[in-house]
């Protein structure tokens, strides 16, 4: 190490405690992820625009690229996704071919569901079968349909649960956020505390108790693997 690097290293503070204990004593935990993909995209764009300049063409701006390009979806539907960020593993390629995505929402949903929890519960297969009309299902309630329509009745994002809590059970935005935090912590006891107010609130809005219990069971299972949409 250089002397400057050594000085920085000496000033670093470490702890032997895990993340949960650190949060309990009031310290903030951040996760920082480095993505080489962003550098690859930057370099690729630079080379493309250098070539376009030679051909006297306008430079490409990533912000201007359409999200509904039919030729791009044709490549995706064939599983030609080698070197495409988050879509390049053998397993997800198989699901892309089955899904045959034709809109950006499909891609986001597949990436969100392609994780151990949803895979173990066959959520990807359920989404694919419902998208192509091969599996019959019922939303059971207009408010549920309004929120889960784009994902064919499958709970995919924490924001959907917050909306369900508000629309179906009458939660305030603050109460819905408490439910979101309980999901984020993935602590079963905290989720259990949310069950009674969710069902009681639904009954007060004239919803069927058994249906409300079934919906909360789905939310509880989702809490074991769910993330927010931006993640």
Predicted regions and their residues:
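Extracellular interaction modules
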Residues: 1-5
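Mg2+-dependent phosphoryl-transfer active-site scaffold
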Residues: 6-226
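Active-site pocket-lining segments that scaffold enzyme catalytic pockets across diverse folds
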Residues: 231
């Amino acid at each position: 190490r250089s002397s400057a690097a050594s000085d920085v290293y000496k000033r670093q503070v470490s702890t032997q405690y895990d993340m949960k204990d650190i949060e309990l004593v009031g310290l903030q935990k951040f996760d920082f992820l480095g993505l080489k993909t962003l550098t690859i995209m930057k370099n690729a764009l630079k080379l493309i625009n250098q070539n376009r300049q030679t051909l006297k063409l306008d430079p490409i701006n990533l912000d201007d690229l359409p999200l509904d390009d039919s030729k791009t979806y044709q490549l995706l539907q064939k599983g030609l996704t080698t070197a495409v960020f988050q879509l390049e593993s053998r397993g997800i390629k198989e699901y892309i071919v089955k899904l045959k995505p034709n809109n950006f929402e499909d891609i986001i949903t597949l990436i969100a569901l392609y994780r151990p929890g949803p895979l173990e519960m066959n959520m990807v297969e359920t989404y694919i079968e419902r998208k192509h009309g091969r599996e019959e299902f019922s939303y059971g309630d207009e408010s549920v349909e309004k929120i889960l329509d784009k994902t064919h009745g499958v709970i995919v994002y924490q924001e959907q649960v917050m909306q369900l809590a508000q629309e179906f059970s009458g939660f305030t935005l603050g109460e819905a956020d408490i439910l979101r935090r309980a999901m984020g912590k993935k602590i079963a006891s905290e989720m259990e505390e949310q069950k009674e107010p969710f069902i009681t609130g639904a009954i007060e809005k004239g919803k069927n108790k058994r249906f409300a219990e079934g919906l909360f069971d789905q939310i509880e299972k989702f809490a074991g693997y769910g993330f927010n949409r931006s993640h």
